[in-house]
Amino acid sequence: MYKDLLPIGSVVKLLETERFVMIVGRIVVPEGVDTIYDYVGCIYPEGISSSDDMVFFNRDSIEMLVFVGLQDVQELTYRSEVLDELGELAVVDGEIVPVVDDEEVDTSI
């Protein structure tokens, strides 16, 4: 299992499926759901033809890393400045917010 968040464009094989999934987004909450997923992806090589094609999953669902997406300066900066500083997350009123000491953070600041 990959410990850090994979870059967009990475291709993985999920547990209990023979299909590959390409990562197209990270740290996502599907509309109408109070669950945060590490990733949203699409079936490879077909891609996205409608919103029904989106696959939401977490790191622990990854069986095998097939391809690592682009890791340039922008990706590394994004990961270090944004993703690494997020810590634990929660969904509050439909928005992703950081959790400090198991309490939701006030996002009105």
Please place each PLM-identified region on the residue numbering.
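Short, well-ordered loop/turn sites that connect or cap secondary structure elements
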Residues: 4-6
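Short, solvent-exposed secondary-structure boundary/capping segments
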Residues: 29-39
